[in-house]
């Protein structure tokens, strides 16, 4: 079945509107949503500020969206910062003192905060107070300021890098995991409606199975298919068009992209399937270690294509099969 795409000139407006505004619009993550819903409604019922929350998991899975939803649920403001920008106490104090009662203060990549800035968070999280130093030298003095009660929401792709004093100050901790294809289709269906794209379930499934379990990527691929259909297929979209559009991005039917294939090929063709160290792989494919560990390796492990061992990464029989290679004797 073929559909027509309504070409709009309002994508800037839709960029933000694709983000869910309440938990009922947030598909997937069933157990996490149930816990968070109870946690938030209990605080609202008591007319209290919700406790501090930490969300961790791979990038693109909705951690920032959950912070927006929390702010909408309690009906207060949302202040957003990034861990790498908060290196010194002075980077943090202005944000803390500017918060209004009930605001949600979201720190993305919270594991990358500076140590001294992090220590200033402790009294702010526990007692809603912060110490500032006035003047310098012998005349320096410390003044404790009261802060408006707020909810800190931290997001991280590396929960293990958080210090224990910071981690234990969060009242709610939730892991955001990869999405299954059914949930991604539901997300894509909502996004397609907001973008005025008509696409049947078969077409959305074609996109979902290549989206690496990640809503952010799924929405980006949906837009790409829309653009491809507009420029190459007379605005007509169906599963065949979607497949052609995604093939142009070098994304295969498992969702593997050019870097994924390169990683597996290097492991199999040059290192007999491994084990091989991540530093070696990074040099071979021209990426840094952290990028490979955060963006590529988790999905390859999830799909059963790579195993981590004490000696390095190993390509599995599934990897050989997917690349049409014959396992070699080691």
Swiss-Prot record:
GO terms for molecular function: ATP binding; ATP hydrolysis activity; four-way junction DNA binding; four-way junction helicase activity. NCBIfam families: PRK00080.1 (NF000868), ruvB (TIGR00635). The gene is ruvB. Keywords: ATP-binding, Cytoplasm, DNA damage, DNA recombination, DNA repair, DNA-binding, Hydrolase, Nucleotide-binding. One of its GO terms (biological process) is DNA repair. It comes from Chlamydia muridarum (strain MoPn / Nigg). Belongs to the RuvB family. Its main location: cytoplasm. The RuvA-RuvB-RuvC complex processes Holliday junction (HJ) DNA during genetic recombination and DNA repair, while the RuvA-RuvB complex plays an important role in the rescue of blocked DNA replication forks via replication fork reversal (RFR). RuvA specifically binds to HJ cruciform DNA, conferring on it an open structure. The RuvB hexamer acts as an ATP-dependent pump, pulling dsDNA into and through the RuvAB complex. RuvB forms 2 homohexamers on either side of HJ DNA bound by 1 or 2 RuvA tetramers; 4 subunits per hexamer contact DNA at a time. This is Holliday junction branch migration complex subunit RuvB. ATP binds at residues 18-19, 60, 63-65, 126-128, 169, 179, 216. Homohexamer. Forms an RuvA(8)-RuvB(12)-Holliday junction (HJ) complex. HJ DNA is sandwiched between 2 RuvA tetramers; dsDNA enters through RuvA and exits via RuvB. An RuvB hexamer assembles on each DNA strand where it exits the tetramer. Each RuvB hexamer is contacted by two RuvA subunits (via domain III) on 2 adjacent RuvB subunits; this complex drives branch migration. In the full resolvosome a probable DNA-RuvA(4)-RuvB(12)-RuvC(2) complex forms which resolves the HJ.
């Amino acid at each position: 079945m073929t559909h027509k795409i309504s070409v709009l000139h309002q994508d800037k407006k839709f960029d933000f509107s694709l983000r869910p505004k309440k938990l009922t619009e947030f598909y997937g993550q069933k157990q996490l949503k149930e816990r968070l819903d109870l946690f938030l409604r209990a605080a609202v019922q008591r007319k209290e500020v919700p406790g501090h929350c930490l969300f961790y998991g791979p990038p693109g899975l909705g951690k920032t969206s959950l912070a927006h939803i929390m702010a909408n649920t309690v009906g207060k403001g949302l202040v957003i910062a990034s861990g790498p920008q908060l290196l010194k106490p002075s980077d943090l104090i202005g944000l803390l003192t500017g918060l209004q009662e009930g605001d949600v203060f979201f720190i993305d990549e919270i594991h990358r905060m500076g140590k001294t800035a992090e220590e200033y968070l402790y009294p702010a999280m526990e007692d809603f107070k912060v110490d500032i130093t006035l003047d310098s030298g012998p005349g320096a003095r410390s003044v404790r300021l009261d802060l408006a009660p707020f909810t800190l929401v931290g997001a991280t792709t590396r929960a293990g890098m958080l210090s224990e004093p910071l981690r234990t100050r969060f009242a709610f901790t939730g892991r955001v995991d990869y999405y299954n294809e059914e949930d991604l289709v539901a997300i894509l269906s909502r996004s397609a409606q907001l973008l005025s794209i008509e696409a049947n379930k078969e077409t959305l499934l074609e996109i979902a199975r290549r989206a690496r379990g990640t809503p952010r990527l799924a929405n980006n691929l949906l837009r790409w298919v829309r653009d491809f259909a507009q420029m190459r297929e007379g605005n007509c979209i169906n599963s065949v068009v979607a497949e052609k559009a995604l093939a142009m991005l070098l994304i295969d039917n498992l969702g593997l992209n050019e870097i994924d294939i390169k990683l597996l090929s290097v492991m199999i063709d040059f290192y007999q399937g491994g084990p091989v160290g991540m530093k070696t792989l990074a040099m071979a494919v021209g990426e840094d270690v952290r990028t490979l560990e955060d963006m590529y390796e988790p999905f390859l492990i999830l799909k059963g294509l790579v195993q981590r061992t004490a000696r390095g990464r190993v390509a599995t029989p599934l990897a050989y099969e997917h690349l049409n290679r014959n396992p070699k004797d080691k």
